[in-house]
UniProtKB/Swiss-Prot annotation:
Induction: By stress conditions e.g. heat shock. PANTHER family: HEAT SHOCK PROTEIN 70KDA (PTHR19375). This is Chaperone protein DnaK. It comes from the Bacteria. It comes from Francisella philomiragia subsp. philomiragia (strain ATCC 25017 / CCUG 19701 / FSC 153 / O#319-036). The lineage of its organism: Bacteria, Pseudomonadati, Pseudomonadota, Gammaproteobacteria, Thiotrichales. Residues 607-620 have a biased composition (Low complexity). The keyword Phosphoprotein applies. The modification Phosphothreonine is found at T201. Acts as a chaperone. InterPro entries: ATPase_NBD, Chaperone_DnaK, Heat_shock_70_CS, HSP70_C_sf, HSP70_peptide-bd_sf, Hsp_70_fam. Residues 607-642 are annotated as: Disordered.
Length: 642
């Protein structure tokens, strides 16, 4: 059985870990980094770039460079958050798919579902693991924000499938971090608050770690969060400040210039990181734009105090879910024994200060905020594979689940923070006499009004025998698996007729869609391979042209004018095809140049070696004379001394 790898699929960065014996190990990517930017770019020549390579070219290719895709995953285009937040913050096109989902599109018009883009990041993780292990990897545990709803969880599973991974378990990020901490911690019973402020989402989980019959039991008591609060928002706050300051100085609004906007975004992210350790930083972007008077440069000093004032409301926004999570767990702040900080944004001193103020204790600094989640995912992978024996994980569903009942009310079957897996049934009836069918409208959320909650799906239970209203007994059962994904069934108790729905279509992707995307991904892998072969052929050709001309120049008059002409002609022939996309033509012309150049070079170098050999022979005789001279001198000196 192959390894089950652990992947933290983040909004900004992703991380990979595997179990190495009894411990989880974070694996470096091909570039030697322990985290990989969750950025995917589609270039003009059809190449797909992932990670650092994609991030590096974002400034020159803003329309086709996709970042923060996790904020779109499993969401509808008409969602308020998509309209108000995402569309205003990203340079690429967010479009409405035929099924109403939020998709993205390249400037060439290629439409893609968010799971399809995320799958490219997962595929890079998969390859990194395979390169490290030297064997195929087909199974993974992938983490999601605790506050992700059913649609977002299912969409994440779809992304795994498109990447060629069977997702054995979806686990919550704070839970994974607690798992990483809890497995190493041997301090007995603890109540831990995991404050997870990542690139795109915020979660708070209250978790109990206890020793139960020798097993490390990690039980989630409650969870809360905000799926639209993260480091990206901190970047945008600073970016908008820089743009506003530049507008005050120069009278030019950079919001409409995608290239400039991307440069300012990158500079804001860099400045944010620097301000975690420095009191002030300079943001210096020469030639950011130009007008009739000439080029303009952006040069703005930003102090830590200024940055903190720009984002203080974002930090304060994270504290409300903390209060709710404590209430749901039935605990007070004094009951918390440890506070863990997870997610790169928790490196910001203001965040650490406010968390310390809220919980009344110093957060732990010995947990790596970028890696803890992936480590926890790898440990869960080890549990599922049977390699880790003494850990029991009890997670919860983050939001209440129910159905729409008469009057447009949501009737809850499973309350939020219920330990999963779980199953719950309730009997409902008809609202009208002789009603032949009922529509089961499945909802997720905390509001009383059905329309104010997230719709997960609908299905009909038909062929109900005619009867007065209130007489038929329709048993509705909700069954949540360990991934937090829901199965709903409805059964007419009189006839035994049953209808059920796995909330699969909520990500908007059917099995056929996913299968097509898997095939596209495989085709992309093939085209990527062909592209790399083409680049390799071009490099070989360029090297041969350079070395041929250099050698002919060095050999000078040892090569006849006719031979020089032949080599130059073959070089020009190769140059005429080397920039094209026909690998066979490049290979053929490369071979032709080799066939012309090799015999000329061999002959010339053989003559050169022969001449050198003859010269060497002459030199070999000379030392004898020298020896005689030295000996004679030596004897002469001795004679004089006598």
């Amino acid at each position: 059985m192959g390894k089950i790898i652990g992947i933290d699929l983040g909004t900004t960065n992703s991380c990979l870990a595997i179990m190495d014996g009894k411990t989880a190990k974070v694996i470096e990517n091909a570039e030697g980094h322990r985290t990989t930017p969750s950025v995917v770019a589609y270039t003009d020549n059809g190449e797909i770039l992932v990670g650092q390579a994609a991030k590096r070219q974002a400034v020159t290719n803003p329309d086709n460079t996709f970042f923060a895709i996790k904020r779109l995953i499993g969401r509808k285009y008409d969602d308020k958050a998509v309209q108000e937040d995402i569309k205003k913050k990203v340079p690429y096109a967010v479009i409405k798919a035929d099924n109403g989902d939020a998709w993205v599109a390249t400037k060439e018009g290629k439409k893609m579902a968010p799971p399809q883009v995320s799958a490219e990041v997962l595929r890079k993780m998969k390859k990194t693991a395979e390169d490290y292990l030297g064997e195929p990897v087909t199974e993974a545990v992938i983490t999601v924000p605790a506050y992700f709803n059913d649609s977002q969880r299912q969409a994440t599973k779809d992304a795994g499938k498109i990447a060629g991974l069977e997702v054995k378990r979806i686990i919550n990020e704070p839970t994974a971090a607690a798992l990483a901490y809890g497995v190493d911690s041997k301090k007995g019973e603890q109540t831990v608050a995991v404050y997870d402020l990542g690139g795109g989402t915020f979660d708070i989980s209250i978790i109990e770690i206890a020793d139960v019959d020798g097993d490390n039991q990690i039980e989630v008591l409650s969870t809360n969060g905000d799926t639209f609060l993260g480091g990206e928002d901190f970047d945008v706050a600073l970016m908008n400040y820089l743009i506003d300051e530049f507008k005050k100085e120069q009278g030019i609004d950079l919001h409409n210039d995608k290239l400039a906007l991307q440069r300012v975004r990158e500079a804001a992210e860099k400045a944010k990181v620097e301000l975690s350790s420095a009191q002030q930083t300079d943001v210096n972007l020469p030639y950011i734009t130009a007008d009739a008077t000439g080029p303009k440069h952006l040069n703005i000093k930003v102090t830590r105090a200024k940055f903190e004032s720009l984002v203080s409301d974002l930090v304060m926004r994270s504290l409300e879910p903390c209060k709710k999570a404590l209430e749901d767990a039935g605990l007070s702040k004094s009951d918390i024994t440890e506070v863990l900080l997870v997610g790169g944004q928790t490196r910001m001193p203001l965040v650490q200060e406010k968390v310390k103020e809220f919980f009344g204790k110093e957060p732990r600094k010995d947990v790596n905020p970028d890696e803890a989640v992936a480590v926890g995912a790898a440990i869960q992978g080890g549990v599922l594979a049977g390699d880790v024996k003494d850990v029991l994980l009890l997670d919860v569903t983050p939001l209440s689940l129910g159905i729409e009942t008469m009057g447009g009310v949501m009737t809850k079957l499973i309350e939020r923070n219920t330990t999963i897996p779980t199953k719950k049934s309730q009997v409902f009836s008809t609202a009208e006499d002789n009603q032949p069918a009922v529509t089961i409208h499945v909802l997720q959320g905390e509001r009383e009004m059905a329309s104010a909650n997230k719709s997960l799906g609908r299905f009909d239970l038909a062929d109900i025998p005619p009867a007065p209203r209130g007489i038929p007994q329709i048993e509705v059962t909700f069954d949540i698996d360990a991934n937090g994904i829901l199965n709903v069934s409805a059964k007419d108790k009189a006839t035994g007729k049953e209808q059920n729905i796995v909330i699969k279509s909520s990500s908007g992707l059917s099995e056929d869609d996913i299968e097509k995307m898997v095939q596209d991904a495989e085709a992309n892998a093939e085209s990527d391979k062909k592209f790399h072969e083409l680049v390799s052929a071009r490099n070989t050709a360029d090297n041969l042209i350079h070395s041929s001309r250099k050698a002919i120049a060095e050999l000078g008059d040892k090569v006849s004018a006719e031979e020089k002409e032949k080599v130059e002609e073959a070089c020009k022939d190769l140059e005429s095809v080397v920039k094209g996309d026909d690998k066979d033509a490049i290979d053929a012309k490369t071979k032709a140049l080799e066939e012309v150049f090799s015999p000329i070079a061999q002959k010339a170098y053989a003559e050169q070696a022969q001449a050198a050999g003859a010269q060497g022979g002459a030199q070999a005789e000379e030392p004898k004379k020298d020896d005689d001279v030295v000996d004679a001198d030596f004897e002469d000196v001795e004679d004089n001394k006598k």
